[in-house]
Amino acid sequence: MSGKVEIMNMDMKVGKTLKIKGKXDDDADGFXINLGQGTDKLALHFXPRFGESTIVCNXRDGNXWGKEQRDSHMXFXPGSEVKLIVTFEEDGFKVKLPDGHQLTFPNRLGYSHLRYLSVQGGF
């Protein structure tokens, strides 16, 4: 995975929506979007893996990752346009994919305010 963008002092509270738009690199094998309190406190790790045709979601608390949630509804490919809408709710996240499919992932760490966003990989 190649590039990385980080925002350290974001102000995203429960009820807010984040729109992410970009283009996957032509030779990308995937990308990752992370939301949380910091690099090791991730409420949502959203990682489409092109080679596996799977979207993996997870949470990270310190050095410990949670149990992966996998969804085989792949709406991304190398070179494709990426448009995501992430809604932060008290009990979890709703991620709307470009084709309208929606994934949900629980707010396992119980955060009510997110300060960290990173986008990395072939994006």
UniProtKB/Swiss-Prot annotation:
Pfam families: Gal-bind_lectin (PF00337)
Official protein name in the record: Galectin-2
InterPro entries in UniProt: ConA-like_dom_sf, Galectin-like, Galectin_CRD
Protein species of origin: Sus scrofa (Pig)
Lineage: Eukaryota, Metazoa, Chordata, Craniata, Vertebrata
Molecular function GO labels: carbohydrate binding; galactoside binding
Domain Galectin: 4-123
Binding site for a beta-D-galactoside: W65, G66, K67, E68, Q69, R70, D71
Listed PROSITE patterns: GALECTIN
Origin: domain of life: Eukaryota
Alphabetized UniProt keyword annotations: Lectin
Bridged cysteine pairs (disulfide): none
Functional note: This protein binds beta-galactoside. Its physiological function is not yet known.
Gene3D superfamilies on file: 2.60.120.200
Subunit structure: Homodimer.
